[in-house]
Amino acid sequence: DGFAIADKVRREHPEIYKYLCRIEVEGMYQGDGVTLLARRPILRLNASGELEQVTFNNYDRNVMRLADDQMQQLYDGIRLIDGLFNDPQYQWRHQLQAGEAIVLDNWRLLHGRSAYVGSRKLAGAYVNREDFISRLGLND
């Protein structure tokens, strides 16, 4: 739960929390004939200053050009939250069975997989958040 981790960092390491809300990190994904770039802080706040999105992916982080002090602040923050993300206390693990589906809020929850033996097929789909929120409001 990225929000639970962000709240812990906010309470126990307020300076690191501020850095993670302010310093933009670029991510890059290349595969399947596409290149996707995104640049945003790891912890993104809404206009009211409330946490809105947690974005963290050590594998797709791109080259960053930051001043030395900002780079050190960012690395301190990454080291802290990476340790928390990998702490079993903040994880829920579930082995999907054939035909099973899971729906999650990609702005709140981080997701991944552990090692497995054998072959598997996993299909993923993303719904645009604005479309989802709009539709939710229409059906409320």
What residue ranges belong to the model's regions?
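Active-site environment of non-heme Fe oxygenases that use a 2-His-1-carboxylate facial triad
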Residues: D1-D140
